[in-house]
Amino acid sequence: IDELGRIVIPKEIRKNLGIRNGEALEIFTNEDSIILKKYFEVRKYEDLSGKLCELIKNIYNVDLVITDREKVISSSNKDIVENTKLNNKFLELIDNREMFISKELSTINLGIDISGYFTIIPIIASSDSLGLVIIISDNDNDYSSLGKLLAKIIADKIDIF
C-alpha cells in the first residue's frame, strides 16, 4: 500500500494474472485477508446473453457466441463450452476494436475447431472494449448489422447500470 492508500500490484504479478493498467478489480475482505478479483461487466449479464444466444439461434438459425475480454460467457452452440479461454486472435480483435467478417468458409478455435462463416463484432461500452459478439453461420449472408445490433444491446445494458 503506498502513502496515498492505494494498493500497488507489481508488474510481474499483473503480467502473470493478465491485469491491464486501468482494469477494474473487485476488492473483498475476509478477516485478515484482502482479495482482489478481476471485474468483468459482461459477466453480470450472463442470463441476458444466454437468452439472446437462444433467441437468435431460433430466429436466424445461426450460432451466437458472446465473450468477455478473456473467455466465452454464452453460446447457442452446445459444442462451445462456456468459460473457454479466447486465443490471441480474438484478444487482438477486442484490443483493436476491430470487426471481422469472413467472406469464405473458414475455421476458428473456441475450445474446438468450428467451421463456417463468421461475423465478429466488439462490444464497446463507455469507450471500453469489453468482449465480442460472434455469429457463426453456414451461409455467406451478411450478419454484420445483426452483430452490431446485439453488441449495442449488450453495451447499452451495461451503460445503464
What are these model-predicted stretches?
Residues 1-74:
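Intrinsically disordered, low-complexity terminal regulatory regions
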Residues 14, 79-80, 136:
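A generic structural motif
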Residues 46, 50-55, 86, 90-91, ...:
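Juxtadomain coupling helices with adjacent low-complexity linkers
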Residues 53-112:
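Structured interaction and signal-relay segments at domain junctions
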Residues 104, 123, 138:
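Fold-independent oxyanion-binding glycine-rich loops
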Residues 113-124:
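A short beta-strand signature within small-molecule sensing/ligand-binding domains used
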Residues 123-133:
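Short hydrophobic/glycine-rich mini-motifs in sensory/regulatory modules
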